Design a protein with these regions (language model features):
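Generic secondary-structure signature for well-ordered alpha-helical cores
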Residues: 16, 20, 61, 65, ...
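Flexible, glycine/charged-enriched surface loops at secondary-structure junctions
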Residues: 25-27, 65-70, 137-151, 168-178
Length: 211
């Protein structure tokens, strides 16, 4: 509020220097990954939920999806980040990470299904990437993960993402490869001068006498 339109490129440039990127508020894609404060700042936290959330967002921002896609990482089973109503949610526990899928908030709430439990952050990230890619490849356009999971079944998704290590790695690799071409930050582009004429101040009109 209070920022003049012609000042926006400079504001976006400053945000970019601080490490911020343009999020997707309405796109059919990843929304900002929600986290709690995790083990660094909460006595109940079992893992670094904030750090894992940052990693997931850096990997997956800009991706196209059949519908909006929400992720969350809660640092303990108290679930302050509401990971169990997200499309992909992580619940940190003392021995690792519980991975949940197919949740939904809003009018028709659906609690997630437990996909599996893993021991390390890297495993959690690989499973997340594989699940996202499977959803992108097989869900119908405008399908949220909740109806998609109900339609194809949890056992099918587990068979592809959890039980088949080679298939999981291939799905994750396809997702990461595609992200090389998708992570285009409009703030950064405009800070560099793209559409600069849109932000230029109009010249004052000069009236000439009629002939």
């Amino acid at each position: 509020l209070g920022i003049e339109k012609e000042d926006l490129p400079a504001v976006w440039a400053d945000l970019g220097k601080a490490g911020f990127i343009s999020g997707q508020a309405y796109a059919k894609g990843l929304r900002t990954v929600k986290t709690c404060v995790g083990s660094d700042w909460c006595r109940f936290g079992t893992q670094d939920s904030t750090g894992l959330g940052v990693q997931l967002e850096k990997i997956s921002w800009g991706s196209n999806m059949p519908h909006k896609f929400k992720m969350a990482v809660s640092g303990c089973p108290r679930n302050c980040a509401e990971a169990t109503i997200k499309d992909f949610g992580v619940i940190c526990v003392d021995s690792g990470y519980e991975l949940h899928i197919g949740g939904n908030g809003g009018i028709k709430v659906r609690v997630t299904d437990l996909l599996c439990k893993v021991a390390t952050e890297s495993e959690a990230i690989e499973h997340a990437c594989a699940f996202v890619q499977l959803y992108r490849e097989e869900a119908r356009y405008l399908d949220r993960t909740a109806p998609w999971v109900e339609r194809v079944g949890l056992d099918y998704i587990r068979g592809v993402v959890v039980d088949d290590a080679e298939g999981r790695a291939a799905l994750a690799a396809r997702f990461l490869y595609s992200q090389q071409f998708m992570q285009d930050d409009p703030w950064a582009a405009r800070a560099k001068g793209f559409d600069a004429d849109e932000f230029a101040t109009l010249a004052a009109p000069v009236l000439e006498p009629a002939q």
